[in-house]
Amino acid sequence: MTKYIFVTGGVVSGLGKGITSASLGNLLKSRSLTIVNQKLDPYINVYPDTMNPFQHGEVFVTEDGATTDLDLGHYERFTGVNLRKDANVTTGSIYRKVIERERKGDYLGATVQVIPHITDEIKRRIKGISNDVDVQITEIGGTVGDIEILPFLEAARQMRKELGQENVMFIHVTLVPFIGPSTELKTKPTQHSVSMLRGYGISPDIIVLRSDRKLDEDIKNKVSLFCDVSYENVINAPDLDDIYDVPLKMHSEGLDVAVNKRLNLNTEEPELNEWKNMLSLKKESFKDVKIAILGKYFGLPDSYMSVVESLKHACLQNNVNLDLQWIDADNYDAEDISNLDGVVVPGGFGVRGIEGKISAIQYLRENKIPFLGICLGLQCAVIEYARNVCGISEANSSEFSQNTKDFVIDLLPNQDLDKDDVGASMRLGTYPCKITKNTITSEIYKDEVIYERHRHRYEVNNKYREVLEKNGLIFSGLSPDNNLVEMIELKDHPFFVASQFHPEFKSRPWEPAPMFNKFIQSAASSQNTDRKSVV
């Protein structure tokens, strides 16, 4: 029978419940258990795909095409388990399903209420992902005390009652703030948070204390006493420089030991040598590479979470340190990139910042600075090449302008922006890509066909492929039917490669995405080359 672990948060949001859940998944998998992670999000949006990146961060795409919370990216990167759409559940999707069933008459005229109908649907979604795994870790988003998460907490409480104490446990992540003027660490917020959680009928089995420093035994003893949790089940999780150090820190604090004991998992010690060996590569890195992300969603760094993590993975693999810089495409200046070792132009939507990206890509192309384009980055590269190499001065995308006849980037044939469900109408999920032989891309992937995740509705217009190819642009990756351009590249350049897909979603710390890996190799080897001076 599957064992269930619910992870809740208290005091403030953004404490790292996702990293805690991912780290626990890592440790349990290292104990030879089969695991799966899940995120319950309390917002009313059915999916996060149309949410503002400044508010929500990036949208993570799963293999089966679900647009999900960015925490699923953490889960996959820490555990290596590819998740499905049922790994992310929102309040909006729950209510929509219940209302649909009510309209069909499935409730036989009953008065539809939060309890039992909403909570029953939540429980169905929680249980529906497990299949035959040993342990399921379900993170409940939000903060205890928020009105939005009450149905999720009630559903979790009912599950412990229905499945038994031995099969369901709760981990509560809280904050122990340091008060500067009095130089004290305060446990009162944690005590109040646990008290509130108990008011909902849930007593945490383990409390994870987030802090900006290591906590002494007195603090842990105090929390143990006032929150009625055994001392060994009070886990200190101080801030660390690298999130990939968290699993080892959690292990040293005894998190997986406490879970193993509480759920009677009867497992051996975790095998963590591979993870330790991966982290040891950081100590062998002596050279810095200056890489910039040229984008437009900089109000929240999480907007490009998977891109940043993929760069870290590649740097780790190549024994170099990442010196990451951020360049706003709205305020781009050539001086910003003239001394860089490489630039990534990631995905995005809308016309804002586009001309800055196109101008920057021209500079990168002409000055032989390594360039990696992703999704929108590929589209901007094609527009730049069409304008400045092919002589199509009005080249543009139909997404950005309707005042031109030269749409080198246009809607996919099956796309319809007038559809009611705009977000779900994109080309989403894993699709095959046929690699062109004797290209840089073929060296990167070493496979004739690869499978990568997509999230787009615009593509290279096939009407312009011939003129682009005649002028030197290489289509190094195509859909199996040759109708969609998946990758482009240039010869006689250290690295000028772009993809319509999102390689960052499949990158792992121990196995970097091949495109990012080659990009960092090129950036490191092309340092100190002569470049055009900026006036």
Question: What are the functions of these language-model segments?
Answer:
Residues 18, 22-26, 30, 342-432, ...:
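Cysteine-nucleophile active-site neighborhood
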Residues 1-320, 330-342, 349-350, 357-363, ...:
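Flexible phosphate-sensing "switch/lid" loops adjacent to ATP/NTP-binding sites
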Residues 437-492:
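Catalytic beta-strand/loop cores that center a nucleophilic Ser/Cys/Thr
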Residues 532-535:
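Conserved small/polar residues in nucleotide/adenosyl-binding loops
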Residues 227, 259-269, 389-393, 519-527:
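Short, hydrophobic alpha-helical segments
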